[in-house]
């Protein structure tokens, strides 16, 4: 039986912790505890930073880790913020708000998949890799989609009064 090296395992444990916080964010959003839902997304972001730094520091980067990271990013910074914004701002509106949140989630998935494909192609290419990022990084997108919600927590209710504007803003992200 092959022995599992702790230094390879540790970054993946942190990634899976981030995934757990993303899942918890969805749970809290569905329970309408929006403050905790946002906090979970922020902690997932911290896990996302730490897992990569630790993997590079321990020289334990792996294909499994890269795939787990993308899946965790999609859930924590694509699905969770989309559901959170839908539940908090668009909960009573089914049309444009639903569409905007779906567009955000779908394009988060596409962006991460494109990144993974480019990363894989760069491994077989002899050329110097291009910048893999297309558009804004998914964690930044999560921060941007949450701005209208965080403004409402500070007493600025413009997001609830301008649903079409918020939907257009989300689609542009």
Over which residues does each language-model region extend?
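Hydrophobic alpha-helical transmembrane segments of polytopic
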Residues: 14-17, 37-44, 100-103, 107, ...
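Multi-pass membrane catalytic core of lipid/isoprenoid biosynthesis enzymes
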Residues: 11-17, 57-115, 148
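Cytosolic, membrane-interface loops and tails of multi-pass inner-membrane proteins
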Residues: 1-2, 51-62, 114-131
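Transmembrane alpha-helical segments that form the membrane-embedded catalytic/substrate-channel core
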Residues: 48, 105-117, 169-173
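Membrane-embedded alpha-helical transmembrane segments of multi-pass integral membrane proteins
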Residues: 21-24, 51, 79, 107-110, ...
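Helix-coil boundary and interhelical linker segments in multi-pass alpha-helical membrane proteins
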Residues: 24-39, 75, 79-102, 147-166
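Topogenic membrane-insertion module of multi-pass membrane proteins
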Residues: 1-49, 54
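C-terminal membrane-associated helical module and adjoining short loops/tails
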Residues: 2, 130-173
